[in-house]
Swiss-Prot record:
<protein>
    <recommendedName>
        <fullName>Putative MgpC-like protein MPN_464</fullName>
    </recommendedName>
</protein>
<comment type="similarity">
    <text>Belongs to the MgpC family.</text>
</comment>
<feature type="region of interest" description="Disordered">
    <location>
        <begin position="23"/>
        <end position="44"/>
    </location>
</feature>
<dbReference type="Pfam" id="PF05220">
    <property type="entry name" value="MgpC"/>
</dbReference>
<feature type="compositionally biased region" description="Low complexity">
    <location>
        <begin position="31"/>
        <end position="43"/>
    </location>
</feature>
<dbReference type="InterPro" id="IPR007885">
    <property type="entry name" value="MgpC"/>
</dbReference>
């Protein structure tokens, strides 16, 4: 799909603006920095998970000690004004152990520990008043219990038990015998959504959109059919081959495969896009055989019925195939870099920009995904098992991206990243329609 260029946004202060870091590949090995010591070997073989603080450090996030965390940044580097966040990036100091907010990722991380957005009776919160949190949750005001409808752990340091619990939460497993029990109903246990580190958030045309660091990718079944076998269950997307099998799950829990699966001795940290997707006029049903009803932008007279359906990751996910490394694209379909390079970004770039997917493409995607005959395969989304329809929102990088050969992160270029405040939905909707029209024009060329 055609990308929206920086030139299309220049001069428009109300345009869609977001932070999106490209994926960064780093070797997990012994390091002199205090945030990642002892988590690998000198031959770059993966040994075990980084704990959360160490993983954040690898991504450039400096986490202060909990004892001195004041709840809000006190350095004045990042400020929150009029619903938006504006931060000045600084060069990353990978060996720094002080508590300065040293780069744009750290600044966004710390400024996000407060209410982020309000949408259709749902309050999206990241962190708490006292300690920084890696995860987020959503509280629906319409529930009498006041309990968060989406939930994930908020711990900064995990032991083995927490790692296992995280895997079960992310992938829909809840089992101690290593048997395949992927149909566990985790909603009853409060474990219904994957974890993301939010790097930016906005409300766009009555839709909640955020850029985030991927910690897992899971779809949530929103079918209203009480007889559906998948009702209220988490739908797992695997980032490791054979994760639906006993061996794949056991290997991941025992930390032998790596968080996303090792490729050529490298550990992949995917710090890139993620989306909350809108659904308008969604039809339920256990087999979801009716026509796809998702549309974007949502019309003004139907915005009240728009629903946040599920999460989608628009980043290459590591898996294994007969012809090399395979990935999921934004529709959850299985592509191969060697066989379909024109559809995918390069391995060295991995900065993904997706256009708006129309209904016919979604329908085709569902039909394609249904063509898989292997029930244990997790290389394609099984659309017959979910009433969720995935629709990527065009949410893209706003800074001037350097030429090939000089691809560095924004904070390494002393760039400025600004997250714009939400504006009136009808105004933003017109802007998105213009983007959509430009995308269609470019695609037809």
């Amino acid at each position: 799909m055609a990308a929206v260029t920086d030139n299309q946004q220049s001069g428009d202060n109300n345009g869609l603006v977001s932070l999106a870091q490209r994926s960064t590949t780093v070797a997990v090995q012994k390091s002199d920095s205090s945030g990642s010591q002892g988590q690998g070997t000198t031959d770059n073989k993966f040994q075990k998970y980084l704990n959360t603080t160490q993983a954040l450090h690898q991504m450039g996030v400096i986490v202060p000690s909990l004892e001195t965390w004041p709840g809000k940044p006190s350095t004045g580097i990042a400020t929150r004004a009029a619903g938006g966040v504006s931060v000045q990036a600084a060069t990353r100091q990978s060996t720094s152990t002080n508590e300065d907010l040293s780069n744009v990722i750290t600044q966004l991380y710390h400024t996000s520990t407060s209410q982020l957005a309000y949408l259709n009776g749902q309050i999206v919160v990241m962190g708490s008043d006292r300690v920084p949190s890696l995860w987020y949750w959503v509280v629906d005001e319409r529930t009498t219990s006041g309990r968060a409808t989406w939930w994930a752990h908020t711990e900064l340091n995990w032991g083995t038990d927490k790692q296992k619990q995280f895997v079960e939460n992310q992938l829909g497993f809840k089992d101690d015998s290593n048997s395949d029990s992927k149909n566990s109903n985790l909603k009853a246990q409060g474990l219904t959504q994957p974890a993301y580190l939010i790097a930016g958030l906005d409300v766009v045309a009555d839709h909640l959109v955020f850029a985030a660091f991927k910690a897992g990718a899971v779809g949530y079944d929103m079918t209203t059919d009480s007889n559906a076998s998948t009702k209220d269950q988490v739908l797992a997307w695997s980032t490791t081959a054979g994760l639906d099998s006993d061996g794949g799950y056991k290997a991941l829990v025992e930390n032998t495969a790596g968080l996303n699966g090792p490729i050529n001795g490298l550990f992949i940290l995917l710090d890139t896009f993620a989306y909350v997707t809108p659904v308008s006029g969604m039809k339920g049903g256990s087999k979801n055989t009716e026509a796809v009803q998702t549309k974007y932008p949502v019309k003004d007279d139907s915005k009240a019925s728009a629903k946040i359906a599920s999460l989608i990751n628009a980043s290459p996910l590591n898996s294994y195939g007969d012809d090399g490394v395979t990935v999921f694209d934004a529709l959850g379909l299985n592509f191969n870099f060697k066989l379909d390079e024109a559809r995918l970004p390069s391995r060295t770039d991995q900065l993904l920009v997706y256009g708006i997917v129309n209904e016919s493409e979604l329908k085709s995607a569902r039909e394609n995904a249904q063509s898989t005959s292997d029930d244990n395969s997790n290389t394609k989304v099984k659309w017959t098992n979910t009433a969720s329809h995935y629709l990527p929102v065009p949410y893209y990088y706003s800074a001037n991206f350097p030429e090939a050969g000089n691809r560095r992160r924004a904070e390494q270029r002393n760039g400025v990243i600004t997250i714009k405040k939400a504006i009136y939905p009808e105004v933003r909707g017109r802007q998105l329609q213009n983007i959509f029209d430009d995308w269609k024009t470019n695609k037809s060329r």
